[in-house]
């Protein structure tokens, strides 16, 4: 029989007591009551913050959007296929935030800045909250620097400044994305960091945009944030805030940034879907009551910062899609009232072959004229006036049979100016060349050129000016105005090229 040795037992117990390390871990845990359609109702979570990140037992992350008396309404940011009634949920104590920094430039990421381009992890040491307060009045400076789009019609008549919010609005298939992409391409070499946010678009469309940016060397200063049509509504709702947060990091470092939200109609639809599933009361067009705040708190983050904060800027180009040209619908009117102007793209003009299809009549820039360079101001005023008169005369000329010579001349010039503003996709024009083309159009240099030859004349003249009078470009770029010397060089180049062109035609 084995004898029991008390001293051995007591030494084992003593050893166990010495090694015992008590760790008390308090977690805020809840239980899933119901789950479906990307929404979970959770019971038992106390002290949860609004917009706090919650973690489900299968690893899915959600955001607490509805804090009710007896349960929490959570929007899932993943599939959540393995979730079921009774699953446990724990609060993380963190509000939605994303990693930011230089490492994101040139990458394609999702709404939580997870890479989706297969180029490995993004190394970042800093995070920023998705919902940051917009700069206050004292922290801002009025817009005064130009944000050149490279599109003649916009830079001349609807100029955009750094720190401005300019809405691009129009029906589907009118070239809204093309205007935004051209603007990004035109920032090459200017030191502007661009963020392109694709919301609820087909993955193939986003891939096409990324290819265009890569082929033209624009991806090296651009971040693409993609929340595709197949992604959960929560990610489509968050993507614009992610884009703003990524740009904000650079803005507060004193850099100029440009953010394109393509498009906010889809974000509003994703938010409507989430709100209705969370049983929030619907308002006009079934959107929730706070859909205005959804967009205003996003677009107010665009700013030109004061010298004390480093004079960085965030320029926002939100895109909104209209149905059959109806700009008086709920989301379009909301965003028009928030932004500092809008570029209206018309399907009628697009189908008539005028591309970019900008309707100059109802497009406006509320602060951009202060940001125009003097050279452009010198020539743009006359262009606006002549085009406005042409539109009036054209409507009148449809009914009149015989027109006097002056009216015929004005109509002919208007048609040539219209041709002058046509521009192929993905080919932005430098501002000094835009000034030269508008000068040629408004000062009668195109009057003898047949209307159907204007496009080839302008393309050839740009090349001729660049090669024969390189000093003209240097003068306009350095002085920012069309001085006597620059104007003299431009006139001689126009006269010489016009003679050659007419001789060849």
From Swiss-Prot:
Gene3D superfamilies per the UniProt record, alphabetical: 2.40.30.20, ATP synthase alpha/beta chain, C-terminal domain (1.20.150.20), P-loop containing nucleotide triphosphate hydrolases (3.40.50.300)
Annotated positions for site Required for activity: 363
Keyword set, alphabetical order: ATP synthesis, ATP-binding, CF(1), Hydrogen ion transport, Ion transport, Membrane, Nucleotide-binding, Thylakoid, Translocase, Transport
Main location: membrane
GO cellular component: plasma membrane-derived thylakoid membrane; proton-transporting ATP synthase complex
Reaction(s) this enzyme catalyzes, per UniProt: ATP + H2O + 4 H(+)(in) = ADP + phosphate + 5 H(+)(out)
Family as reported in the entry's similarity comment: Belongs to the ATPase alpha/beta chains family.
Record function comment: Produces ATP from ADP in the presence of a proton gradient across the membrane. The alpha chain is a regulatory subunit.
The protein's name: ATP synthase subunit alpha
Source organism of this protein record: Cyanothece sp. (strain PCC 7425 / ATCC 29141)
Gene assigned in the entry: atpA
């Amino acid at each position: 029989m084995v004898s029991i040795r008390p001293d051995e037992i007591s030494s084992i117990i003593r050893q166990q007591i010495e090694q015992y390390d008590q760790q008390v871990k308090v977690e805020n845990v809840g239980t899933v009551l119901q789950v479906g359609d990307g929404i979970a109702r959770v019971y038992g979570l106390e002290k949860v913050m609004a917009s706090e990140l919650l973690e489900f037992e299968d690893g899915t992350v959600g955001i607490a959007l509805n804090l009710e008396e007896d349960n929490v309404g959570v929007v899932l940011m993943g599939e959540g296929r393995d979730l079921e009634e009774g699953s446990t949920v724990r609060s993380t104590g963190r509000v939605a935030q994303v990693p930011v920094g230089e490492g994101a430039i040139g990458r394609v990421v999702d709404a939580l800045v997870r890479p989706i381009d297969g180029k490995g992890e993004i190394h970042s040491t800093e995070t920023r909250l998705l919902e940051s307060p917009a700069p206050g009045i004292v922290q801002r400076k009025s817009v005064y620097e130009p944000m050149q789009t490279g599109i003649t019609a916009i830079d001349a008549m609807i100029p955009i400044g750094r720190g401005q919010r300019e809405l691009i609005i129009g029906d589907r298939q009118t070239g809204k994305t093309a205007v935004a992409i051209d603007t990004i391409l035109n920032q090459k070499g200017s030191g502007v960091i661009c963020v392109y946010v694709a919301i609820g678009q087909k993955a193939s469309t986003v891939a096409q945009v990324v290819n265009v940016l890569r082929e033209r060397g624009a991806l090296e200063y651009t971040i693409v944030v993609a929340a595709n049509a197949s992604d959960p509504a929560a990610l489509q709702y968050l993507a614009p805030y992610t884009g703003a947060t990524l740009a904000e990091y650079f803005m507060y470092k004193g850099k100029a940034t440009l953010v394109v939200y393509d498009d906010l109609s889809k974000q509003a639809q994703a938010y409507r879907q989430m709100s209705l599933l969370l049983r929030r009361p619907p308002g006009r067009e079934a959107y929730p009551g706070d859909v205005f705040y959804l967009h205003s708190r996003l677009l107010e983050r665009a700013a030109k910062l004061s010298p004390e904060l480093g004079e960085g800027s965030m320029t926002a180009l939100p895109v909104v899609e209209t149905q059959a040209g109806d700009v008086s619908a709920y989301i379009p009117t909301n965003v028009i009232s928030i932004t500092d102007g809008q570029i209206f793209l018309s399907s009628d003009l697009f189908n008539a072959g005028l591309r970019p299809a900008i309707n100059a009549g109802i497009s406006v820039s509320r602060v951009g004229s202060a940001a125009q360079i003097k050279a452009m101001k010198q020539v743009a005023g006359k262009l606006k006036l002549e085009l406005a008169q042409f539109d009036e005369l054209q409507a009148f000329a449809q009914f009149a049979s015989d027109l006097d010579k002056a009216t015929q001349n004005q109509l002919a010039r208007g048609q040539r100016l219209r041709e002058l503003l046509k521009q192929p996709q993905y080919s932005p024009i430098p501002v000094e060349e835009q000034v030269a083309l508008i000068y040629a159009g408004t000062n009668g240099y195109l009057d003898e050129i047949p209307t159907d030859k204007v496009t080839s004349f302008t393309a050839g003249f740009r090349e001729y000016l660049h090669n024969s009078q390189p000093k003209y470009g240097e003068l306009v770029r350095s002085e920012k105005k069309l001085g006597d010397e620059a104007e003299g060089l431009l006139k001689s180049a126009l006269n010489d090229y016009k003679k050659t062109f007419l001789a060849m035609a």
